[in-house]
């Protein structure tokens, strides 16, 4: 499996729980590298503890597929010479999604293929608005709902606040699960408008659900 985001981790957890031998090839030193470091490091450790083989700092060079099911994934690793490979009955590539957009729509498309909008979802074509996966940012349904509300209120002549991207919650339904909302410590430290930054850790050993399930 190639990737270290939500889709890769959810499939890795599901197949691993079903008894399959799963190998995860990731480019960084931990999964969910865009999240808080502690969250990514902890989930990496727990996935390994549950039997998922995680190969870090790996760059896939090519994939060989046969006539039948099965694929050999070739990769190199940072700090190591030569190319290595791993074989599997199924190779899943989960390295992100691209929006399906077209310049023929008459709106500006950015370098990553997203429809360019202002903070209220307005494109540069009068009367045309954009929400959801075609816009830059988290490709999450609840974010799109909030964008839709902002657009509707703007059209109605109200004065809504733009969607605060930092408060959009994210969750990965892996085993164990991971959730995130707000700024990471690193992101907060990079902002000049924040004077004081505090971090609080809540141990899962104090969570009743985790204790009952034996996943604390």
List each model region and its residues.
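Gly/Ala-rich phosphate-binding loop of Rossmann-like dinucleotide-binding domains
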Residues: 12-17
